[in-house]
Amino acid sequence: DRLRSRGLGDVYKRQVCIAAEHQRKGYGKRLIEHSFQRAVELGYDTVVIFGSPSNYVSCGFQSCEKYNICVEGGKYPAAMMVKELIPDVLDGRKWFYHDSPVMAVSEEEAQRYDDMLEKLEKKWQPSQEEFYIMSHSFQE
């Protein structure tokens, strides 16, 4: 089976960004929980994300392996997590996650778009390396 929202199409959440002075106050978690409510209202039953587990487990996300959801080749990415919005909707079957073509953005196109925006200072955060490691690691 292909992991889909029962014919509803896909919804994408790229990032939840909270200004540094407001982090660790629960705002990100509240935004995510609100998105769950909205998704259920729209008829969605499952959320699959790629992220750092330390940011999402407290919102109810669990390892994709626990739900038997893998990527091509039967691999379970360490950064791929799942939250059932409707309990037991995935019913123990094996599911395959496939990226949407919408997610394939070229670096050149992204740079052209960025060039139209107000210039901001680019920064590097340790969490970026953490995510890189997690997103290139697999559970066995």
Name every feature range the model reports, one short phrase each:
Residues 17, 81-83:
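Short beta-strand element of the conserved SAM-dependent methyltransferase core
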Residues 41-44, 51-75:
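Conserved active-site alpha-helix within GNAT-family acetyltransferase domains
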Residues 21, 84-89:
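Short loop segments at secondary-structure junctions
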Residues 76-80:
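Short hydrophobic/aromatic beta-strand or adjacent loop that forms the aromatic wall/cage
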Residues 13, 18, 24-39, 48-49:
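Conserved acetyl-CoA-binding loop-helix of GNAT-fold acetyltransferases
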Residues 88-140:
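Acidic/histidine-enriched, glycine/proline-rich intrinsically disordered or flexible terminal extensions
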Residues 1-12, 56:
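Single conserved hydrophobic/aromatic residue that forms the stacking wall/gate
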Residues 46-49, 81:
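Short, hydrophobic beta-strand segments that form beta-sheet elements in well-ordered domains
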